[in-house]
C-alpha cells in the first residue's frame, strides 16, 4: 500500500517484494518503479554503471516494454543432476530436454523398472512441476492467462497422473535426480566429483517446462522507487552491489578451500558481474572436493560450466509465490488429491486468477 501510494524507501529488493500480496509485475505496470536506463542516461558520473560489465542475458530479464525496472544482483541455474549409471538406460542414448510431455513417460519407465525408484525424492517436487505449468500460462505483467488450450488441458491431465503415480512411501525412494533444481556451484561440482569417483559420468537436465529450455532464477534484484528524490544515490548503491569485490566475496569466488561444513553458503548464488563470474568458476576448478581429496576433471568442469553459460531464460525468484500459495494453493491441493475433478479445477483456476489479476 505504501509503495502504491508513492511512499516507501528509495531502494526496494526483490526479497521484500516477494512478501507482498500484489505481484511485482503488477507494481511495475502501475509505475511504482523507475526506469533505471533513464537514471543511467541522466547521470553525469563518469564512472556510472556500465551494463556491458555484466551478464546481458540476466540483466535483460529486468526489461518490460523496453524499460529496465530492476537490476539482477545474483542468480541460480535450475539444474537437475543425475548420472549415467542411474539414468542413461531410460534416455534412448539421447539426453532429452525435459518438457511436460516427456517427463511423465520418463517417470513411468523408471517406476516400472523398480518400484522404489522415482525421478524425485519427494512428492512435493511433482507438485512444483504442476505449479510451474500453471505459472507458465499466467502473465502477471500483461494480466493475461490461458487455461483453455488443448495443450494446457493435456499437460494438466498428464502431470496429475505423474503426481498420483508417485505418491508413495518417501522413506524408501531412490531418486534419479537431485530434486530442488537449485545447486550452488561448489556443491554441484562436489556431487559431480563424487560421480567421477564412482567411475561414472554426470548427466545435467533442465527443470521441466513447456519448451524444454534450460532456465535460471534471479535470486536477488534491486528496484528504485519512481518517487525517489535520490535516484543517483540509489544507482551508486547498485554499482556497489554489482562491483567485482562485493560480488566475488558474496558468491564465494575468494574462498581458500571448499569444506561444506565450514563454507556453507559460499557460492550459493552466482554473480552477474562478468569478472566475478569468471573468478568463481576459476575457484571452483581450483579447489578440491569430496572432503578436500579430489579435483574435478577438465571435461566435467566444462560440461557444467557450458550448461550454465548457455542459459538464456531467467525469471525473478518468488514472482508467483503469493499466487501459488494464497490464490490457487488450496484448489491445486484438492485437485491433486482427487477431491475435485479436472473441469471444476480449471473453472475455479480461471475464476481465481481473473479476480487476482484484476484486483
Q: Language-model segments: what does each one mean?
A:
Residues 1-25, 330, 339-359:
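Conserved N-terminal structural module of periplasmic/extracytoplasmic solute-binding proteins
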Residues 6-10, 34, 67-68, 112-117, ...:
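Loop/turn elements at helix/coil->beta-strand transitions in domains of secreted/extracellular proteins
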Residues 15-79, 199-207:
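Hinge/lid segment of periplasmic solute-binding proteins
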Residues 34-52, 95-98, 135-154, 209-212, ...:
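Short, solvent-exposed loop/beta-turn-alpha elements that line the ligand-binding surface or hinge
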Residues 61-82, 101-148, 171-183:
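Extracytoplasmic/periplasmic solute-binding protein
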Residues 107, 133, 140-172, 193-207:
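Glycine-centered hinge/linker elements that transmit conformational signals in sensory
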Residues 195-272, 312:
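Extracytoplasmic/periplasmic substrate-recognition and gating elements
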Residues 278-358:
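C-terminal capping/gating helix-and-loop segments adjacent to ligand/active sites or protein-protein/ligand interfaces
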Amino acid at each position: 500500500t505504501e509503495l502504491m501510494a508513492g511512499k516507501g524507501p528509495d531502494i526496494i529488493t526483490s526479497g521484500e517484494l516477494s512478501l507482498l500480496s500484489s505481484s511485482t509485475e503488477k507494481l511495475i505496470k502501475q509505475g511504482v518503479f523507475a526506469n533505471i536506463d533513464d537514471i543511467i542516461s541522466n547521470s553525469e558520473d563518469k564512472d556510472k554503471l556500465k551494463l556491458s560489465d555484466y551478464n546481458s542475458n540476466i540483466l535483460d530479464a529486468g526489461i518490460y516494454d523496453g524499460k529496465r525496472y530492476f537490476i539482477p544482483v545474483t542468480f541460480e541455474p535450475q539444474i537437475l543432476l543425475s548420472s549415467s549409471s542411474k539414468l542413461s538406460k531410460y534416455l534412448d542414448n539421447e539426453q532429452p530436454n525435459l518438457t511436460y510431455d516427456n517427463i511423465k513417460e520418463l517417470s513411468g519407465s523408471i517406476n516400472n523398472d523398480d518400484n522404489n525408484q522415482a525421478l524425485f525424492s519427494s512428492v512435493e517436487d511433482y507438485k512444483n512441476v504442476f505449479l510451474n505449468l500453471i505459472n507458465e500460462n499466467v502473465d502477471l505483467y500483461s494480466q493475461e492467462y490461458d487455461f483453455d488450450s488443448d495443450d494446457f488441458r493435456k499437460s494438466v491431465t498428464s502431470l496429475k497422473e505423474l503426481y498420483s503415480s508417485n505418491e508413495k512411501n518417501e522413506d524408501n525412494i531412490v531418486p534419479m535426480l537431485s530434486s530442488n533444481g537449485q545447486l550452488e556451484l561448489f556443491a554441484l561440482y562436489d556431487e559431480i566429483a563424487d560421480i567421477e569417483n564412482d567411475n561414472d559420468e554426470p548427466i545435467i537436465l533442465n527443470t521441466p517446462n513447456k519448451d524444454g529450455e534450460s532456465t535460471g532464477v534471479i535470486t536477488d534484484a534491486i528496484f528504485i522507487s519512481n518517487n525517489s528524490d535520490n535516484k543517483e544515490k540509489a544507482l551508486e548503491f547498485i554499482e556497489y552491489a554489482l562491483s567485482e569485490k562485493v560480488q566475488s566475496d558474496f558468491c564465494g569466488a575468494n574462498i581458500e578451500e571448499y569444506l561444506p561444513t565450514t563454507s556453507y553458503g559460499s557460492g550459493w548464488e552466482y554473480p552477474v558481474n562478468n569478472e566475478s563470474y569468471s573468478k568463481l568458476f576459476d575457484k571452483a576448478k581450483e579447489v578440491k572436493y569430496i572432503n578436500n581429496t579430489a579435483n574435478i576433471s577438465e571435461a566435467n568442469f566444462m560440461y557444467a560450466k557450458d550448461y550454465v553459460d548457455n542459459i538464456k531464460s531467467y525469471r525473478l525468484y518468488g514472482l508467483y509465490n503469493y499466487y501459488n500459495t494464497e490464490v490457487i494453493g488450496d484448489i491445486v491441493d484438492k485437485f491433486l488429491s482427487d477431491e475435485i475433478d479436472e473441469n471444476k479445477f480449471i473453472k475455479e483456476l480461471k475464476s481465481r486468477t481473473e479476480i487476482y489479476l484484476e484486483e
